[in-house]
Amino acid sequence: MPTINQLIRKKRKSTGKKRTAPALEKCPQRRGVCTRVSTTTPKKPNSALRKIARVRLTNGMEVTAYIPGIGHNLQEHSVVLVRGGRVKDLPGVRYQVVRGALDTAGVEDRAQGRSKYGTKKG
């Protein structure tokens, strides 16, 4: 515990904020190429086959991104747009693929929340 005089001489150092999506390097999204598309199982109370893609970004980093929505058309060498946003029940997945951008098709027959899944009206 510092004394009052020590605090006057040298202020307390604040701990900086931890970045949630460091691979994007302060960009809102990044383009990348899929190196592997697969499924994985979530953490303990949940059970499913979640679709994920390993993506090499334009800055050279390789990240694991979640593919949201029902069904997708991604395969190896697909060019995708990646945004930040973790998936709570998948450890190590801190990015998501943007649906309806570049090689990623939007979700078919989506009626509500269409803007999040790249689906046109009608």
From Swiss-Prot:
Keywords: Methylation, Ribonucleoprotein, Ribosomal protein, RNA-binding, rRNA-binding, tRNA-binding
Stretches the record annotates as Disordered: 1-24
GO biological process per UniProt: translation
Keyword NAD attributed: no
SUPFAM superfamilies: Nucleic acid-binding proteins (SSF50249)
Positions where 3-methylthioaspartic acid occurs in the chain: D89
Biased composition (Basic residues): 8-20
MF terms in GO: rRNA binding; structural constituent of ribosome; tRNA binding
Annotated Gene Ontology cellular component terms: small ribosomal subunit
Pfam (any one): Ribosom_S12_S23
Record text on subunit structure and interactions: Part of the 30S ribosomal subunit. Contacts proteins S8 and S17. May interact with IF1 in the 30S initiation complex.
Biological role stated in the UniProt entry: With S4 and S5 plays an important role in translational accuracy. Interacts with and stabilizes bases of the 16S rRNA that are involved in tRNA selection in the A site and with the mRNA backbone. Located at the interface of the 30S and 50S subunits, it traverses the body of the 30S subunit contacting proteins on the other side and probably holding the rRNA structure together. The combined cluster of proteins S8, S12 and S17 appears to hold together the shoulder and platform of the 30S subunit.
Family statement drawn from the similarity comment of this UniProt entry: Belongs to the universal ribosomal protein uS12 family.
PANTHER family: 30S RIBOSOMAL PROTEIN S12 FAMILY MEMBER
Name recorded for this polypeptide: Small ribosomal subunit protein uS12
Organism: Natranaerobius thermophilus (strain ATCC BAA-1301 / DSM 18059 / JW/NM-WN-LF)
Classification of source organism: Bacteria, Bacillati, Bacillota, Clostridia, Natranaerobiales
